[in-house]
């Protein structure tokens, strides 16, 4: 028989209280779910990792299944423990990835801090995918420099004085290279080897290399004033620059590697640095570099040469100044020089000498003019062959 009426209402009250408490627990769980979801969204927005999206998807699907069973079947599953466990797993994985990324950034800063500008390092740290440590072929500009007569300079100084002078010089030069986002490859005694266009792409690599070379020569002028006042030896730097396809990357043994470059275009830059002595110049660039940077620089055409180790002739230029910034009487010197070069190419060596000497009246120490006066005199005594192509063959590296 049904329970007496006076028993029904207490039973109904107990049942209503239980259902109300159950619904309250559900609401608490739903609030917890929302909190977890908000935290998950925050993690995704901050870390932007694919793994976080997977965790978020798991949380959403699990919550949707629970809501479905509660609405249509009256079943309530525990949301708190699985979702908290899922979220803790996500935090653990992200902490691991964070530590891994931090280790990678520390490696990048340690590996490149000595020869990359801080701005370039920051770019690589923000996007390590831009850095390829394996060998790759890039369009780049290679730079070589060497101090003229450094052996004589070193013999006049004590070891301590020599190291102090060299450190002062190298620091000043490398500051300029870094300011133009160049990469210092290595030092070989007093020589500096650097490049532009790696590890990050730089469409203006030739221009930046030329601008850096010009500023480095300006720094040398300032340094020589200081050295003269301190009664220390003067330093004059020869530089060679060439652009083109170059192989660059981490090279070496299994235990010791360097981020460096190699290739024919690198070798040509080294040859041009040494070739300065034949023209009594200090900064020489190849035709490839000139074509890429001609809108930003003033140059003097020097010669068509065949350097040691290369069969193809190369046009070479003296890098003089930034565009429209020629100093003193150089513009007038160049006018006489160009007339002399036209005579030289047409085998009119006497007329060529006259024009070169007119230039020397303005700049008595002009290296290329002195070089061509001597060469024209040589050809007057020993004329070139009838099939002469105008190419001058170097018989030594310089």
Model regions and ranges:
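Transmembrane alpha-helices and their extracellular/periplasmic helix-loop junctions
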Residues: 25-115
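Short, small-residue-biased leader/transition segments that mark boundaries at the very start
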Residues: 2, 11-27
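Cytosolic regulatory/linker segments at or just downstream of nucleotide-handling modules
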Residues: 246-248, 277-346, 357-358, 363-368, ...
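Catalytic NTP-binding/metal-coordinating core of nucleotidyl cyclase/transferase enzymes
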Residues: 130-215, 256-259
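Intrinsically disordered, low-complexity, charge-biased linker/tail regions
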Residues: 385-398
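Membrane-proximal helical linkers
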Residues: 102-134
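Alpha-helical scaffold within the catalytic cores of cyclic-nucleotide enzymes
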Residues: 166-182, 198-239, 243, 264-277, ...
């Amino acid at each position: 028989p049904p329970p007496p009426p006076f028993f029904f209402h207490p039973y109904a009250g107990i049942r209503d209280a239980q259902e109300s408490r159950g619904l309250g627990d559900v609401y608490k769980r739903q609030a917890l779910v929302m909190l977890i979801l908000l935290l998950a969204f925050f993690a995704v927005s901050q870390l932007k990792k694919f793994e976080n999206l997977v965790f978020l998807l798991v949380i959403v699907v699990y919550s949707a299944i629970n809501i479905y069973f509660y609405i249509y079947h009256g079943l309530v599953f525990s949301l708190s423990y699985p979702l908290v466990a899922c979220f803790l797993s996500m935090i653990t994985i992200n902490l691991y990835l964070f530590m891994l990324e931090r280790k990678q950034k520390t490696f990048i800063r340690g590996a490149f801090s000595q020869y990359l500008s801080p701005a370039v390092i920051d770019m690589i740290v923000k996007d390590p995918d831009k850095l390829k440590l394996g060998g790759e072929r890039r369009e780049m500009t290679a730079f070589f420099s060497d101090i003229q007569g450094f052996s004589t300079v070193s013999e006049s100084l004590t070891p301590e004085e020599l190291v102090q002078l060299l450190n002062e010089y190298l620091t000043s030069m490398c500051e300029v290279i870094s300011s133009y986002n160049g990469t210092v490859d290595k030092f070989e005694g007093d020589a500096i080897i650097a490049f532009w266009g790696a590890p990050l792409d730089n469409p203006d690599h030739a221009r930046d290399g030329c601008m850096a070379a010009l500023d480095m020569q300006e720094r040398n002028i300032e340094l020589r004033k200081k050295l003269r006042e301190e009664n220390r030896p003067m330093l004059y730097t020869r530089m060679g620059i060439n652009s083109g396809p170059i192989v660059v990357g981490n090279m070496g043994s299994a235990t010791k590697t360097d981020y460096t470059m190699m290739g024919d275009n690198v070798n040509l830059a080294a040859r041009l640095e040494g070739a300065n002595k034949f023209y009594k110049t200090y900064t020489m660039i190849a035709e490839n570099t000139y074509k890429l940077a001609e809108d930003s620089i003033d140059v003097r055409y020097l010669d068509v040469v065949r350097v040691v180790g290369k069969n193809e002739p190369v046009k070479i230029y003296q890098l003089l100044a930034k565009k429209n910034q020629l100093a003193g009487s150089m513009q007038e010197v160049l006018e006489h020089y160009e007339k002399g070069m036209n005579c030289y190419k047409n085998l009119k060596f006497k007329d060529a000498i006259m024009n070169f000497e007119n230039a020397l009246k303005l700049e008595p120490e002009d290296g290329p003019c002195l070089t061509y006066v001597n060469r024209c005199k040589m050809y007057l005594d020993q004329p070139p062959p009838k099939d002469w192509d105008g190419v001058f063959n170097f018989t030594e590296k310089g």
